[in-house]
């Protein structure tokens, strides 16, 4: 198994455990990164773009790593399943990313509700990637 895919699975498992222990901010971080890592793995495994080539593409694209990965997957979804599903996917991952940024960087209390929302979004994204890209 790919190390990145394995990290993705570890992170979703960690998100669940962290919620049970009331470490809500950390759980959101893990929920998001489980999806980000699975998207990078999908680009490698399904689309055949190895990690080194991804790094080169990112550095020449003028985009940040997370922006590039999200845009790549959503653009490919547009081709495979249509604009509606692509937009829905992109909106969900961006919502999850926003939760992660607020949780990591803002001086706020992170609640059970926020962490559960992040986990639900992450599980949906992961299931979607696994189903549609056989990863």
Annotate each language-model stretch with its function.
Residues 1-135:
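Terminal alpha-helical segments
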